[in-house]
Each structure stands twice: as structure tokens, then as C-alpha cells.
Amino acid sequence: MPTPEPPQKAETTDAPGPDRGADEAPGVDPWDRMPEGALNRPDLDGDDDEPASSGEGGAGAPGPGGDTADAEDSPGDDGAPAEGAPAPSRLDFLPSPVFVLLLGLTGFAGWLSWRAVELDWAAEGASVTPLIPPLLILLGWIVSSAVHEFAHALAAYLAGDRSLRGSAYLRLNPFAYEQAFAGLVLPSLYLGLGAFGMTGPPSYVDWDRIPSRGRRAAVALAGPLASLLLSAVLAAVVTVLVPPGNDTTNWAIAAMALLSFANLTAALVNLLPVPGLDGFEVLAAAAHRAPWVPAARRNALFGSVAVFAVLWFPGVREVVVNLVYGLFDLVLPNPVFPGIAFYGELLLQFWA
């Protein structure tokens, strides 16, 4: 039986030879017996965006296994990262090496404070002004502030603000914040001057990307919730180390007690519905399209500083401090916790 001619467009790469097997039944169309894929048809198997090529190894030609190259693996194809732009990675959600180093320094300062090594370094009978405990408190507060902002950023990302992926806020790197003054400098100044915790406004969140009121409110409340959890963990550690009926002047324990106090004040103060605080964003979630919301957000930094200035007044600060200490007395079994936290305040403000 003569071999039928293939279509003119097709290029036969492994067409059957002229000899037919003896078992081939007469009258059967040879095309029905031809193995699938025997014809190299670029217009059927190749990429429509690539010209057909009859040369060996040309575009659209199958490899040794008969498979064509995956279009997604080719540089410049649709779906591939733009030239010069970093590809999305799981590393976008891992803590940065800077944060790991920060944790290590905090732990080392805590160990030195626990051992009170500065007393061993000083000459016998000499007066000692401890400098490692205030460093421990500062490092611990930077870590606490980074966790506060991370909670905002993670909630915002999950709620729809994908622009935060890979940012310093999600990777817990406070030294690379876009709003470093509001996220790093101001909280450190608030703690150093007032010995209580406050954070800057979450101005890095793109609230327009978050679709619903409930999600926007959840993003705003994520930061205070994280600070509240940190305060509870630190208070629990202090309670375990100093059981009821005992007291201590250990520098590391006093630093943890003060950090617990600072995180609790940060959680409570941030609930105030004032521009620059998280409570305002809860209020703005219900009136997202109101004309006064963008103007208030543009001046959020001034609102945060104004709240700190009011709380810094001696009479107001005394009321706030007594309120927070009263909450600790209600929850914790050891009534000496406020005294331990106050000792941490004395260690922090060594210049006073």
C-alpha cells in the first residue's frame, strides 16, 4: 500500500518507513495507525507567539523527550518578574538578620544585667551607675515596638494591603522603616523621657487597599493587642522569678517589669481616638470616606506628640501610672510588681 502524503505544512520527523508489517490489515487507513506525535506540527504543538521553524532545535521544536519548553520559564514572558524587580519569596515573611542580631544583643545585655557585672568591674567601695540595664531596656523596647508594628503590617497584608510584602515592617527591621522617625525614634524618646510606652502612627498602611470597615478596624487593633500580649508574657515571667511574698533588686528582672509596664501603657494609650494613635484608625474605619480623615492622617505625627506632651505633665502622668499599676495589682498575685517596675524606671533614667 503506498504511503499517503502528509499535509504540506507538516514536517514528518519520524514517519513510518516504506515497509509495512505483515500483520497490517488491508483497507485500514494508515493515518489511524500512526503513533501520536509522529508529525511535528508547530502550528499545533508550538507556542502561538513563536514562529514555526523547521530547523533542528528551532523554536517550538520538541526536545529529546518530545516536550516543549515551558513558556513561564522563559525570561520576559508574561507572568515572569519584571526586569530588575525582586521575585516574591518566602523570605519576605522571615525576620531580618538585623532583628535576629537585635534579639541577640538584648539577650546578652540581659545576661550581663542578671549577673550585675558592672559591680564586679568597679573598684571596691566605688559608686556605680549601671549603664547596661538602661541599654537592656532600650533594646527590649525597640524589639517590643517592632513587634507592635509587625502586628499592624501582618494584619494589613492579610486584609489586602499587598504593598507591605517584603517590607521592613513585615521583616521586623526597625532600622529600615520608611517612617523611621515615627516607628523608631519617637517610641524611644517617649520611653526615655516619660518612662512609659507609646508608639508612632501606622502611616505606612495603605488603608485604601483594605476593603471593609471590619478589616480596617482589625488592622488598627492588631498593634495594641500585640503590645498587650507582650506585657502579659513579661509580667508572667517576672511573677515566676519573684513569687508572692518576695522582692528583688535584680537589674534584669526590674528591666522586664518596666518593659511589661511600657507595653501595657502602649496598648492602653493607643486606644485613644486621637489622630496618630490606633484608636483613631478604629474610628476612621467607620468613616473611611469622610473628608476629615485624610487631613487627620497627614497630621498624625503631631497628634502623637501632643498626646505624649499631655501625658508628660506630672499630674496627668501620675494618674496614668497609678491606673496601670492598679491593673497589675488586680491581675498579678505579687503586690511588689509596681515597686520592681519603678526600680526599672530608676535604672532607665540614670541621669535623673
Model-derived features: where do they sit?
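Hydrophobic transmembrane alpha-helices and their immediate loop junctions
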Residues: 1-352
